[in-house]
Structure formats: structure tokens, C-alpha cells
Amino acid sequence: KPCCSIHDNSCCGI
């Protein structure tokens, strides 16, 4: 699954 998803936003860099 992609990093910038509803389950994982910390991967987005926020």
C-alpha cells in the first residue's frame, strides 16, 4: 500500500 494513505500519513512527511 502507498505511504500517503488514510492508514499511514506519517510516511507523507507530515
From Swiss-Prot:
* Entry comment describing in which tissues the protein is expressed: Expressed by the venom duct.
Give compartment(s).
Secreted
Which residues are reported to carry the modification Isoleucine amide?
Answer: I14
- PTM: Contains 2 disulfide bonds that can be either 'C1-C3, C2-C4' or 'C1-C4, C2-C3', since these disulfide connectivities have been observed for conotoxins with cysteine framework V (for examples, see AC P0DQQ7 and AC P81755). Contains 2 disulfide bonds.
Q: Name one GO molecular function term.
A: toxin activity
Q: What is its main location?
A: secreted
Q: Which UniProt keywords apply?
A: Amidation, Disulfide bond, Secreted, Toxin
Q: Which GO terms describe its cellular component?
A: extracellular region
- Tell me its family: Belongs to the conotoxin T superfamily.
- What does its UniProt record remark on the domains? The cysteine framework is V (CC-CC).
Q: What is this protein called?
A: Conotoxin tx5c
